[in-house]
C-alpha cells in the first residue's frame, strides 16, 4: 500500500495536507477544498475531477474498444484515467471528455500520449482535470471550419495542465464562457496556415475568456491571429454565479499572466474583449519572430458589434483592462511596456478602459529572459522530458 501511495504521489494524484494560496470571492466550500493537484492555480485550482472515484486503466492505443481512452471516458461515474501505454492514439472521430473525470496523462510511460486527427472536446463536460496530453489535430483525416485541436464553452470547473495543442484548422485551443477555469503550463502553437478553411488562410490561436478564468504560464507561438482573442461578454452567457454578479459583464473576469507570445505573424495577434468584462494582462513576455509585423503590439481593445457576435444589450461595450509588468523585446524600453503597446478602438481611450481587478492569487514571476527560457522548456506535455521539441 505504501508503495502504491508513493507512486500516486509521484503522479500528483493525491493532495498534500498543506495550506494553499490566498482566496478571494470564494464560496465556503471552495475555501475548505484542497487544490486539484500540487501546483494547481487560478480559478480552476479547486476542481475535483475524478477524485474519490474509480481508477480506469488505458491498456492500448486503439481508437475505441475495451482498454482504449474512448472506452475509458465512456465509463459511468467519477473516475481517474491512467495509462499503461504510451504513443499515438489515431482518433477516428471527435473525442468527448466526460464529466467528473481526471485524465492523468503523466502516468503514461515513455514520452506520453498524443491524440491525432480529431478534436478533444469539452462541450459536454463539467468538473474535469486533464494533464500531460498532446493534441495534434491536422487536416489529414477531416477538414471542417470548426476543427480546433481542443475547445469547450458553457461548462464549469475545468483545469488543463502541461498539455500541448497544435495543428488546427480553426483555432488551436478555444475556451470561453466557462465558469471556474484554468489553463496553465500549456503549449498553444502552430495553427495551420491554409488547411482548407472556407475563409482561406487562417492560423488562429484561440478565443479565451470566462466567468472567472485563468490563463497563466502558457506558451503561444507561430500563429497569425487570435494570440489570443479575448471573448468578452459578447454572447451574454448566463452560467455565472448570480449571488456574486448582477450580469454577465460583471461576471466576465479573465486573468492572463506569465504567458510567452512568440512570432504572432502579420495578423491581429492579441485583441478582443468586446461586450465588456474585466481582463488582467500581467507579466507576460512578447518576442516578435520572423513573421511578426507589429513587433511591439500587446493587445487591441475591441468593442461589441454585429460583426463579432455582440448581442443587443452590449453594442459598443469594451472590457476594462489591468495591464502591468509586461515585457516586449522589440520595444526601445521593453520592461513594463504596457499601455504603450495597446491599440485602441477609435471611440475609446486608455483612460476609459483602465482598471485594477483583484483575482485569486497565483504564483507570479517577473518576465525576464530567464523566464522565457524556462517557459519554453517547462510547458511540455511529457512528464519524462522538459524539452519543447519532445512535446510533439
Give the residues covered by each predicted segment.
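N-terminal secretory signal peptides that target proteins for export/translocation
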Residues: 1-9
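Long, contiguous C-terminal flanking segments immediately downstream of a protein's structured core
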Residues: 41-42, 54, 286-392
Amino acid at each position: 500500500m505504501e508503495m502504491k501511495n508513493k507512486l500516486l504521489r509521484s503522479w500528483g494524484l493525491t493532495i498534500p495536507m498543506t495550506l494553499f494560496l490566498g482566496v478571494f470571492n470564494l464560496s465556503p466550500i471552495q475555501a475548505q477544498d484542497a487544490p486539484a493537484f500540487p501546483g494547481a492555480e487560478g480559478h480552476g485550482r479547486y476542481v475535483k475531477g475524478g477524485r474519490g472515484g474509480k481508477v480506469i486503466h488505458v491498456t492500448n492505443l486503439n481508437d475505441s474498444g475495451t482498454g482504449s481512452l474512448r472506452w475509458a471516458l465512456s465509463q459511468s461515474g467519477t473516475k481517474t484515467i491512467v495509462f499503461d501505454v504510451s504513443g499515438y492514439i489515431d482518433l477516428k472521430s471527435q473525442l468527448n471528455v466526460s464529466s467528473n473525470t481526471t485524465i492523468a496523462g503523466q502516468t503514461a510511460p515513455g514520452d506520453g500520449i498524443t491524440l491525432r486527427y480529431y478534436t478533444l472536446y469539452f462541450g459536454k463536460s463539467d468538473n474535469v482535470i486533464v494533464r500531460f496530453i498532446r493534441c495534434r489535430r491536422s487536416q489529414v483525416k477531416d477538414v471542417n471550419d470548426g476543427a480546433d485541436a481542443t475547445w469547450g464553452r458553457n461548462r464549469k470547473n475545468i483545469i488543463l495542465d502541461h498539455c500541448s495543442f497544435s495543428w488546427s484548422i480553426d483555432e488551436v485551443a478555444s475556451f470561453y464562457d466557462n465558469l471556474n477555469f484554468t489553463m496553465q503550463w500549456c503549449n498553444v502553437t502552430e495553427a495551420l496556415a491554409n488547411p482548407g478553411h472556407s475563409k482561406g488562410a487562417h492560423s488562429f490561436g484561440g478565443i479565451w475568456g470566462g466567468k472567472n478564468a485563468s490563463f497563466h504560464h502558457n506558451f503561444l507561438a507561430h500563429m497569425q491571429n487570435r494570440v489570443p482573442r479575448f471573448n468578452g461578454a459578447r454572447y451574454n452567457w448566463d452560467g455565472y454565479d448570480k449571488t456574486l454578479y448582477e450580469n454577465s459583464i460583471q461576471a466576465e473576469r479573465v486573468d492572463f499572466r506569465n504567458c510567452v507570445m512568440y512570432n504572432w505573424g502579420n495578423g491581429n495577434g492579441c485583441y478582443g474583449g468586446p461586450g465588456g468584462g474585466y481582463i488582467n494582462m500581467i507579466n507576460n513576455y512578447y518576442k516578435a519572430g520572423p513573421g511578426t509585423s507589429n513587433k511591439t503590439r500587446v493587445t487591441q481593445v475591441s468593442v461589441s458589434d454585429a460583426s463579432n457576435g455582440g448581442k443587443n444589450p452590449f453594442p459598443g461595450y469594451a472590457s476594462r483592462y489591468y495591464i502591468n509588468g509586461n515585457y516586449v523585446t522589440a520595444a526601445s524600453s521593453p520592461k513594463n511596456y504596457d499601455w504603450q503597446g495597446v491599440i485602441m478602438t477609435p471611440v475609446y481611450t486608455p483612460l476609459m478602459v483602465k482598471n485594477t481587478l483583484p483575482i485569486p492569487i497565483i504564483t507570479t514571476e517577473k518576465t525576464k529572459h530567464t523566464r522565457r527560457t524556462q517557459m519554453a522548456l517547462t510547458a511540455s506535455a511529457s512528464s519524462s522530458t522538459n524539452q519543447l521539441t519532445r512535446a510533439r
